[in-house]
Amino acid sequence: LFESYCASILATSALGVAAFTGTGLLPEGFTAGDMQLRAMFLPVVLAGVGILLSVAGVFMVRTEEDASQKSLLKALARGVDLACIGVAIVSLGLVYWMLPNFLGVCVSIITGLAAGWLIGKWTEYCTSDEFAPTRKLADQSLTGPGTIVTAGIADGMRSVWAPVVVVVVAMILAFGFAAKWNLNDVTWFAMGLYGVGIAAVGM
């Protein structure tokens, strides 16, 4: 996880530099070097803020001594939700400060954030004993190890469709928002790729 997160930060920084190599996207009063530095440091700053807010979210988790699995999941969800809301708010301020003419990048960040949140909820549904898939799988053990192994493999294969759909939709939306939906303009293509990268950092 750490390696993939660092890779997404570095890749997004590189895409940010590439997006402002020409003069087509430069706002008035900014040089290419200014915008490249801002686009390069945005994912780094966003990741740092996200880590701090995640730590703060951990301290928001409160449970009772003999809490059930359901109440534990709710407490964890509360911490995650608060951290996500915090990142969304801070990202708006960061993008407004660092890339003021490209607020679509903020929407790309929120898109990635929402995609990560949805995938987390789906994972919880597929793996928690509070929900139907795991309970049905437990019932398979009554007939022996063969059926539970087969059912487990089938459930695992079946569970990946939602994350795939969410990631594909998030990529399309992140690209479009960052590129301001100028899909036929080559100048904005690199900015769209930057949006996909920054969405991965937000995720």
Residue ranges and their predicted role:
Residues 1-203:
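Hydrophobic packing and interface segments
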